[in-house]
Each structure stands twice: as C-alpha cells, then as structure tokens.
C-alpha cells in the first residue's frame, strides 16, 4: 500500500478549493481542514457538554482533530473534488480506490461513529460559512442554498441527535452582526498588565 509522504501532505497548502464557484478569495485544502477541525471540536463540546482540559474530552478532541485534518488529504493528489464529481465518482467506487492509496494513517482516521458524524457536520458548516463570507455572485448563492439543504437533510437522515447543536452553531456562524472577542481580550490584557 502506498502512503502519503510529508511532502505530499505539505501540498495541501497549495491545493485550492472552490474551483467552479466564484469566490472573493482563495482557500486551500489546508485552510479548510484546519477550520473543519476547529468547528468539529467546538461542536463536540457543545453536543457532549465536555470542556477542553478534561481528560476524556481531550482524548476525543484529539481524535476529532486528526480526522478533520485528514478528511480531504487525498485531494493533494486530485485537487479539490467538487460535489457533482464526488457523486459521480462514488457511483463508480473510484473515490474508495483513491482513498485506499492514501495509506493506513488516513484510513484509520476515517473510522465511523460519532466522531466521523461530528467532522462531517463541521465540513458542511465550514463550507457554508466560506460561501456566506466569500461567495461571489448568483452561482455561489445557489451553491450555498443547495449546501444548506444537504446539511439539513444530512442532520435529519443521519445525525438527528446532533441537529440542535449543529443548527445552533450555524446560527452563530451565520449571524452577520456577531462580534468576535478579539478586541475584548486585547483590552482585558491591557487593563490587567500591571
């Protein structure tokens, strides 16, 4: 079995996503995978009530991070694979054959169960967020709408126990009036730097 080399993995930072969807900026597979990992860990804590720093939670968060970082690794060989192409390739088992060449690390990280469900939901959330923030034009809006429909269909059919946590996270992400805490933290640090 072939395995991915470190040089193969480093190519993820150069493989761009959204080839057929107009966006206002580019995104690499590496950026996408990192964002999916962050969202999946947040979603896991929301769903389970766990907190980072708790031993059991940290073990699960580690597994989630690994799966999220690996989930699109085969795209270092193929480039970004858009959804219509994935549907076509899945029908012919070509994606399974490609994934089998990625090596044991990739295959082990893709085991099923609740962690895979969590990462799949985070993958949807990250893509919807990216299109909401950076999608450009009518076609991008149509893609966002279709992605949102597939997201809710996935929750209803495959992840009903995750629905409330996933929808709440999407509402938070899609709130255009929401603020980050960056400047609050800077001001706090300034005020307490004595």
From Swiss-Prot:
Residues reported in the UniProt entry to bind dATP: 17
Annotated residues for binding of Co(2+) 2: 75, 80
RNA-binding listed as a keyword: no
Top-level taxon in the UniProt lineage: Viruses
Residues bound to Co(2+) 1: 32, 71-72, 123
Metal-binding recorded as keyword: yes
Catalytic activity: dATP + H2O = 2'-deoxyadenosine + triphosphate + H(+); dADP + H2O = 2'-deoxyadenosine + diphosphate; dAMP + H2O = 2'-deoxyadenosine + phosphate
Function: Catalyzes the hydrolysis of dATP, dADP and dAMP into dA. This step is essential for Z-genome synthesis (containing aminoadenine instead of adenine). Specifically removes dATP and its precursor dADP from the nucleotide pool of the host, preventing the incorporation of A into the phage genome and favoring the integration of the Z-base into the viral genome.
Protein name, UniProt field: dATP triphosphohydrolase
Organism name: Salmonella phage PMBT28
Name of the gene this protein is made from: datZ
């Amino acid at each position: 079995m072939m395995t991915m080399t470190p040089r193969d993995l480093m190519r993820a930072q150069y493989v761009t996503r959204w080839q057929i969807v107009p966006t206002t900026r580019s995104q690499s597979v590496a950026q996408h995978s990192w964002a999916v990992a962050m969202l999946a860990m947040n979603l896991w804590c929301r769903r389970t009530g766990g907190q980072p720093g708790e031993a059991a939670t940290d073990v699960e968060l580690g597994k989630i991070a690994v799966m999220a970082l690996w989930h699109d690794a085969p795209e270092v060989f193929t480039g970004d694979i858009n959804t219509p192409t994935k549907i076509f390739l899945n029908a012919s088992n070509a994606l399974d054959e490609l994934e089998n060449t990625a090596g044991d690390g990739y295959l082990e990280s893709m085991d099923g169960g609740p962690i895979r469900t969590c990462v799949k939901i985070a993958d949807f959330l990250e893509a919807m967020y990216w299109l909401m923030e950076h999608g450009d034009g009518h076609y991008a809006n149509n893609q966002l709408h279709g992605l949102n429909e597939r997201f809710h269909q996935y929750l209803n059919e495959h992840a009903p126990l995750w629905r409330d946590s996933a929808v709440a996270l999407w509402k938070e992400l899609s709130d255009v009036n929401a603020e980050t805490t960056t400047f609050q933290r800077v001001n706090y640090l300034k005020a307490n730097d004595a």
